[in-house]
Amino acid sequence: MAKKQEIRPKNFSDFVGQNKLKKLLKVMISSAQVQNRPLDHILFYGNPGTGKTSLASIISNSLNSRIKYAQGNLLDKKTDILTLFASVEENDIIFVDEIHAINKNIEELLYSILEDFVVDIVIGVESNSKIMRLNLKPFTFIGATTQINRISKPLRDRFGLIGQISNYQVEDIEKIIKNNSKKLNIQIDEKATNLIALYSQNIPRLAINLLKRTKDFCIYEECQIIDYKLVNKTLKQLGIYENGLNESQVKYLRSLSETFYKKAVSLDLIVGFLSLQKETIISEIEPLLISNNLIVKTPRGRKITQKGISYLERI
């Protein structure tokens, strides 16, 4: 079986965009190396697919440190925390993705771990119990979250840097597509590159996934280069519309325009009509529609905008 292609950037030069944050990280890394001490703990926040895990990996490469990955939603019990840090070596990096999903009942364990590199364990029960303190070797903790508002202040205060992953520009996404087309050994022309970028919601991961799916069609049709026509065909097959909307989002728009006659309508009515969970609509469907000004939230409910009406007429 062929080895899976690794397209994640390995260094800061490979990582497109986020120039201010990259500069700050390079300064921190250089300072830590000169002082021969671990890098301060870092918290990255931003939208999914924008490079938080990649930056953690690049930091690990820059420091020549071992990195251990974990998911916040899997850190549910005290033993999960203890297991995560039990084998930590000096200058290791512990990366926890979606750190906001850590069980809040065990979050306090992290405070002393991050601040003093110690963990207190209760041995025994009730009157016979005693606290045993374990000293950990100095390490760097990197957290990533898509929901910074769910990170408690005591936990946030343990990070030496809180870095926001800012929105990408179309030019950044186009460069990411070109860089990854080389890694994927596929040629792509300028118009095709621009079209993928415009349909990617300015999110690197989505752009790369669209490039991969277009490559699949290119191989299937035995073409030599990805062009505008092939990208357009791929997008239609995937059910992806202008600005990166999917079929569920377009159906939502059509319901506001046609079923509810362009009037403001309550979320409960929309939920009933689309047969979707309320949380799915709020977190998965509406954000892109709102950011593109295709719908607005009013005191009376959701309403399609004139831009949203024009969008439906255009697609």
Swiss-Prot record:
Pfam families named among the record's database cross-references: AAA_lid_4, RuvB_C, RuvB_N
- Tell me which UniProt keywords the record has, alphabetically: ATP-binding, Cytoplasm, DNA damage, DNA recombination, DNA repair, DNA-binding, Hydrolase, Nucleotide-binding
Q: Which pairs of Cys residues are joined through disulfide bonds in the record? A: none
Cite the binding residues for DNA.
Answer: K297, R302
Locate the residues binding ATP. I7, R8, G49, K52, T53, S54, E115, D116, F117, R158, Y168, R205
Q: Where in the cell is it found?
A: Cytoplasm
Family label: Belongs to the RuvB family.
Protein name from the UniProt record = Holliday junction branch migration complex subunit RuvB
Lineage, uppermost ranks = Bacteria, Bacillati, Mycoplasmatota, Mycoplasmoidales, Metamycoplasmataceae
Q: Which gene encodes it?
A: ruvB
